[in-house]
């Protein structure tokens, strides 16, 4: 008994219990709910083995029953087992609800710890970015152009073609017209022009009336035009 190795951590104790009582404890996967009062059964069964103390057994049991995989196993309809895997009664609703709350709290703590770690990493990265500026690249010296030897013939520089300014198109000369001052001087068949805005259309006198002069345009259309719209 003196040469038995000593278990130093709660995880090592749990591994020992899973090997010693495989129908009760498990080292991985979903765990089965334990019998109420199983601590005393452990003390009676493993007293002196592996130099285990009551304190070690109690700490290992606390770690085992607070693990997520054990809390997942505490659910409605599950049955408690003793050290040999024998059923020891079904879980009551109070214990199931307590395990559910413990699991939710454990998950919340883990999420809070992860969020805090991420925040610290971001702060550290931001602080490092402010303190350390990116090193500037050194400018490479410009290559020196070799000097022209004395007496060497200088190459003529290529002359750039001179671009000629585009000629501005001359505005067409406006045709000068003489306004008709007296329509009584006009004769039938006389050629003249009818002003329409800035343009003047060719026309022929058909008739002289009291309202104006009836003319015929080159298009064949005839109309009466007043004197101020007629020019030669």
From Swiss-Prot:
Source organism superkingdom: Bacteria
Function: RNA chaperone with significant RNA binding, RNA strand exchange and RNA duplexing activities. May regulate ProP activity through an RNA-based, post-transcriptional mechanism.
Keywords: Chaperone, Cytoplasm, RNA-binding
Protein name: RNA chaperone ProQ
Keyword Repeat applies: no
Record localization: Cytoplasm
One Pfam family cited in the UniProt record for this chain: ProQ
GO cellular component: cytosol
Segments of skewed composition (Basic residues): 137-146
